[in-house]
Design a protein with these regions (language model features):
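A conserved beta-strand element that flanks and buttresses the S-adenosyl-L-methionine
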Residues: 152-153
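Short alpha-helix
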Residues: 204-234
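A short, conserved alpha-helix within the catalytic core of class I
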Residues: 160-173
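Conserved beta-strand signature within the Rossmann-like core of class I S-adenosyl-L-methionine
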Residues: 176-189
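Short, glycine-/aromatic-enriched active-site segment of Class I SAM-dependent methyltransferases
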Residues: 189-205
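Core SAM-dependent methyltransferase catalytic element
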Residues: 240-266
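Rossmann-like AdoMet
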Residues: 1-85, 89-132, 146
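Short amphipathic alpha-helix with an adjacent loop that forms part of the alpha/beta core around
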Residues: 138-147
């Protein structure tokens, strides 16, 4: 029997991005392999019709998955015994694709979101679940931390927040860990103000915040330094070969979402 899912607003985006990964996995020449997402979609009682028609959302999710999977895997290969904190995890399954490459993995999201995750994914170690907001500093108490290296992933969240909330999230991270790297997805202000994704608008979630680049983000969270910026154009190149050409155009790279790598050293 399929499980009914009732979500609206920003939490609903987790179901739509899950569908995008499952849909790509089913393709003959799939660029990602997310069998867990495929299985979850089969067991969800949810109308995926808007997500299925939203090509922009689908391409964006897969491009982001390609880029972040690559970046996280490379990081974990260089940094043994890392604690990974996945903020606003939704129904993300990267922890399974990276299994065996980290010490502990903590999936964090709002209680109503984690209630849905627990229906389908029982995680009891080395993958753990924390049902709290990333702006609630008590989530740190649920992390078994003894000065290990920490990687924080913030994917698909910042564009729904405001600058004050961004500062709060980074402040908690900065105060809690001695050595920490943050991989955060950001959206350009142009896209926030002028672009609408059909499935996102249908969920009543709205884009509200963006930054042009890492330097702009560093001005907001000066305790961190920018180490790297990777445009999601790099993922689009694997989905649409034309991006090998148009991806060189500055405006295309500038308005594409980015993964910005920030570091704080003790």
């Amino acid at each position: 029997m399929k499980e009914k899912v009732n979500v609206t607003g920003v939490p609903e985006t987790m179901v739509q991005t899950l569908y995008a990964r499952a849909k790509e996995t089913r393709k003959k020449n799939a660029k990602i392999n997310d069998e867990i997402a495929e299985e979850l979609v089969k067991n969800l009682d949810y109308d995926f019709s808007k997500a299925d028609k939203d090509k922009a959302m689908n391409y964006g999710v897969i491009a982001r998955t390609i880029v972040l999977d690559r970046m996280v895997e490379q990081y974990l290969e260089k940094n043994a015994n890392t604690i990974v904190i996945n903020i606003a995890c939704g129904l993300d399954t990267r922890c399974y694709r990276m299994k065996g490459k980290y010490l502990h993995w903590y999936n964090i999201d709002l209680p109503e979101t984690m209630k849905i995750r627990r229906q389908f994914l029982a995680e009891t170690g080395p993958i753990y679940q924390i049902a709290k907001s990333a702006m609630d500093d008590s989530y740190i108490d649920d992390i078994d931390y003894h000065c290990e290296n920490v990687l924080v992933i913030i994917e698909g969240l910042t564009m729904y927040l405001c600058e004050k909330e961004i500062r709060k999230i980074f402040s908690i991270i900065e105060k809690s860990f001695q050595e920490v790297t943050v991989m955060v997805e950001t959206m350009s202000p142009f896209v926030v103000n002028h672009v609408k994704e059909k499935s996102i608008e249908g969920s009543n979630a709205k884009f509200t915040w963006g930054v042009k680049n890492g330097k702009e983000l560093q001005r907001i969270v000066p305790e961190f330094s920018v180490q790297q910026e990777v445009s999601l154009v790099e993922g689009m190149k694997e989905l649409m070969p034309v991006y090998h050409v148009i991806g060189k155009i500055p405006i295309v790279r500038n308005i594409s979402n980015k993964i910005i790598v920030m570091e704080k050293h003790g």
